[in-house]
């Protein structure tokens, strides 16, 4: 199975973003309508909620909607207000000892993965992995604030925004973990997610958001796919979230670790998953080196990709996703 990842630089919304949107819109439209048009919020409601909760993004949203063709359906999709449910299986850790970095494995379906890394300068410079055309799965801004999302393991969907857009908003408007916490705890999320934050001062937190209860600020450096309790046993069994959090707890206490040694550990099960058939295989390992303002993507086959704010290069990489014969590593 081949994973394609394209690195695209476009500081302001324009022709490159428009081309990417046009390529992905057929698939996104099918997903957006998967529960029927009546299940999705109307344009007026969606735009009003975006203006209320993330007003700084409104001019950008209007520009992107125009580039997307100016249609009602496209604008409703881009608002990311009350989208269909979706979930992933991820492991993430903020490290702030001698070195400061955020590392994560993103586990999802390779067929549904957008496969785009974007450098933008909308409200401030941001580098991240794209989802839903302008949302982010993880990313870092030029201030050195990094954020990463993991599904919270709760089979509940409510009224709120898709978490990738919330991640985009946080990185566009915040400079520190404290700033990000304020924003994260003030915006409704349509499903449960765990957002791990790390800033240039080494301050970290993981925020549990949910559609049916108040957010919880957890001053923890690690997260997998449950929150305070296991709410969905079937999902827990399928993704081994408790096993993975135990491994991360062990690693975070080993202060002799370096970013290179921890990165290698993230390339082994149970943190690294080969469960592609059930859409929970690891698609990439991302490490955000905060002080260097660099993003490193790595894979078990020794493929690597590095980008930075100082030298972002447009490129494309193909990765062969295979294996499953690599032993688990706990030490």
Task: Identify the residue ranges that each predicted region occupies.
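Short, glycine/charge-rich beta-strand/loop segments that flank catalytic centers
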Residues: 73-94
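C-terminal, well-structured catalytic/ligand-binding subdomain of enzymes
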Residues: 1-70, 80-81, 97-179, 183-186, ...
């Amino acid at each position: 199975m081949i994973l394609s990842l394209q690195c695209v630089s476009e500081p302001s919304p324009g022709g490159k973003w428009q081309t990417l949107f046009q390529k992905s819109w057929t698939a996104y439209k099918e997903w957006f309508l998967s529960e029927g048009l009546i299940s999705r919020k109307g344009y007026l409601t969606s735009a009003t909620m975006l203006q209320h909760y993330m007003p700084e993004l409104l001019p950008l949203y209007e520009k992107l909607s125009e580039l997307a063709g100016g249609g009602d359906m496209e604008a409703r999709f881009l608002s990311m207000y009350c989208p269909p449910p979706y979930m992933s299986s991820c492991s993430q850790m903020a490290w702030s000892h001698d070195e400061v970095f955020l590392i994560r494995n993103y586990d999802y379906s390779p067929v549904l993965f957008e496969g785009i890394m974007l450098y933008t300068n909308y409200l401030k410079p941001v580098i991240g992995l794209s989802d839903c055309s302008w949302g982010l799965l993880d990313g870092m801004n030029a201030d050195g604030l990094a954020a990463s999302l993991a599904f919270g393991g709760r089979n509940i969907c409510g009224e709120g925004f898709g978490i990738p857009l919330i991640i985009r908003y946080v990185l566009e408007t915040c400079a520190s973990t404290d700033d990000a916490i304020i924003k994260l705890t003030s915006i409704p999320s349509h499903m449960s997610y765990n957002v791990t934050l790390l800033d240039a001062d080494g301050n970290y937190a993981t925020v549990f958001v949910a559609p049916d209860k108040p957010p919880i600020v957890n001053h923890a450096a690690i997260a997998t796919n449950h929150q305070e309790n296991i709410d969905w046993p079937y999902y827990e069994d399928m993704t081994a979230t408790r096993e993975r959090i135990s491994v991360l707890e062990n690693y975070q206490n080993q202060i002799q670790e370096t970013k290179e040694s921890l990165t290698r550990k993230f390339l082994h099960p149970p943190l690294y998953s080969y469960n592609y058939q059930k859409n929970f295989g690891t698609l990439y390992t991302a490490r955000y080196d905060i002080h260097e303002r660099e993003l490193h993507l790595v894979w078990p086959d020794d493929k690597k990709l590095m980008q930075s704010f100082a030298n972002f290069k447009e490129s494309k990489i193909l990765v062969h996703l295979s294996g499953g014969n690599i032993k688990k590593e706990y030490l």
